[in-house]
Amino acid sequence: MITRRDFLKVTAAGGALASLGSVTEAKAAMKSAVPDEGFCHEGARKIPVIAEVDLVVAGGSSRAIAAAVAAAKTGSRVYLVGYMPYLGEDICGSHLYERKEGEKLQTALARKLFPGKNFPTPLHIKKTLEDELIDNNVQFLYSSYVTNVLTDPSGKPAGVVIANRSGRQAIRCKTIIDATHNASVAGLLGAERKPFIAGSQEFCYTVVGNTPKEAPEIIQAEELSQPIKVGEKSYPVTRYTFHLPLKDDSYASLAEVEQIIRNRTWDIDQVDSSDLLWYIPKQTINSEKAYNGNPVSWRKLPMQAFKSKNIANLWVLGPCAEIPRELAAKVMRPVPALFIGEMMGETVARQIKDIPVPAQATVRQLKVNASNYGQTGELLSPLRPSLQKGFVASPAGALPVLGSYDVVVMGGGTAGASAGISAAKQGANTLVLEYLHGLGGLSTLGMIGVYWDGFRGGYTAHIDKSVLAMAPKDHPRQPKGEGRFPADWKMEWHRKELLQAGGKLWFGVMGCGALIEGSQVKGVVVATPFGRGVILSKILIDSTGSADIAIAAGAAFDYTGKKTIAVQGAGTGKWAPGDYYNNNDWLFVDDTDILDVSRAFVQAKTKLQGQYDLVKIPQTRERRRVIGDYIISVYDVINHRRYPDTISYHKSSFDTHGMIIDPLFILNPPEKRHKIYDADVPLRCLLPKGLEGILTTGLGASAHRDAMPVIRMQPCLQNQGYAVGYLSALCVKENKSPRKIDIKKVQRHLVKIGNLPERVLTDKEFKGFSNSEMKKAIASVTDNYK
């Protein structure tokens, strides 16, 4: 976007040069002065430093852990940053549990991971890798993306900046091992690499339980030698090899390929599949010395092929190393890569032993004449007072604009999936962004696949009927009883509904900030496995479940802490193929605190030892709640308060899992354990106070913590998501903000489909009680204040 001031500067400079007869120079000057709309300006800021170490390892693959542990054993201080909610993203994420013929277990870690002839379970892999880090004093975080790098005054690596649900933090170091699949950290440092060439790319994808499929893009469908056995059940495992075009080196292109592959392979018998595509990128870095041979042993593989040519102290432990692509396909499989990782960890540790951590470091920023779309807001608070190591400067720079959409939904969970589908069905150009590799959130990947309470009419009734209709009534996986849904069926139904409606879907993306101009939210800042960027929106739906983006934009919020330590119980349950309900309540966790989340996953693996696997998302019932234009109270629920702008209808008991704090409950605790209350939620509770162009849904809505249990049931939030998606699309069509939209028009549609009772069309605003009415009420109180 070019401003009036920019326009005047450009035309003045170009005119001056043209008047001197230099038309070529005039064109060049104008081109360099015109802001690039493909980039968004970002202002200067300071990033909190949480650690200072010798080595940072970026990536959570088995080879990354091997390198980190090997370096730690030499005495190096190591910090590992993994972007998935588990370690072993190559084995567990891409489903590479088998050993190929000739793959020898040459390291102690390899022998621990693959102890016998049978395929190891995901939980065994994850816990073994985690224990290796803990036992060797390697610090690590889950669910964190490397988004920027630190450099010293000479341009050498001096650390990384990471993004997670706690915000962004910096880690200072001497050197970096980039163990990401696409050498994304090397890219952030400006490491030279071969040019990208568009064309056909080979991708591998593994499914469990399905019958083999045929499609023009499938060049091989191999049934692996061992099925997956859980109890008395046995499931075949099929690995597909696809040839598909990769249009460019953007994350959007990879996301598109992923959805095509999922389209071609899914059926109703599927009980599991890869989170991540396995492939060997055609691009490599330019290394100190390319290797073109075929070593007789992995030990003969020269480390120079893994070291950047133009960036000192940068190593690439991944398939983008400068080795032949056929060789990369062999050595990046888990067993050989464990050996390579161990070699690299030892080599790097020796080379940096006597090098000091750079005394000065700043965030490396893109040098682009970026457009001024607005300001980027984010959380920049230290994780803990005890971890505060100062700050590093992040000068003004630029973020790539990854796309522009009518409606962007950040979070594809219980409400977010419905919101995206609804907006797309109304014709809005819609993008849904989800951190995990499936839709539905806690209702699917969180293994809470059975309804408790909730209003099951309206759009939810459509979901329920449609999901169960995906298979014949006599299918062995059809659940017995109402309100139960196989997790993978529901995930797939959401996914296909969104895509068939014309929506776009990117998995593996985390929201880490907001783009704002004044009070207007204009987009979301995201972290992807390829780096950080901005996605522009006309309407942004914050379905993170904890108002992450609204808070980053400056919205006030409420949560446990200063006022009270009360928090509802949570869990981190087991999972095995075919499961859809493993609810539990055994821990307390703040799922917006990355240290607490990482701790919960560590603790869960010990508790669940011997199980097949565990969930990929903490099963939390209480999160940050935005302060909206209105805050629903316990009194509103008990008194059945009505509103003229009701957007969703809810039915539940006070299903609290922990201490209640509202003073009303001291006088008069909730009645019977399972008394059902009906509650309306007005649109005002989904509108962050002081912000335009954004709505929050679900557990992030504006409500008192003791009122939230009545309005957080899955059936109700599916309906709420649909309503918000419909409203957002209408805002785009009519070019109005959510506060200016004709709410009665929205309500009429929601009444028609059964989301809302017809009375909402005539409900009036409650004006409250006068002082005289309150005095009369107090005087008439009897029967223990009831």
Q: Each predicted region: which residue ranges?
A:
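Secretory targeting signals
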Residues: 1-2
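N-terminal export signals
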Residues: 6-28
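C-terminal segment of N-terminal export signals and the immediately downstream linker at the start
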Residues: 22-54, 60, 364
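Conserved N-terminal/central alpha/beta ligand/cofactor-binding core
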Residues: 44, 70, 76-77, 81-155, ...
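Flavin (FAD/FMN)-binding glycine-rich loop and adjacent Rossmann-like elements that form
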Residues: 46-47, 90, 102-103, 119, ...
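Beta1/beta-strand and adjacent pyrophosphate-binding region of the FAD-binding site
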Residues: 50-61, 402-413
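Loop/turn elements at helix/coil->beta-strand transitions in domains of secreted/extracellular proteins
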Residues: 53, 74-77, 136-138, 312, ...
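N-terminal Rossmann-fold NAD(P) dinucleotide-binding loop
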Residues: 64, 416
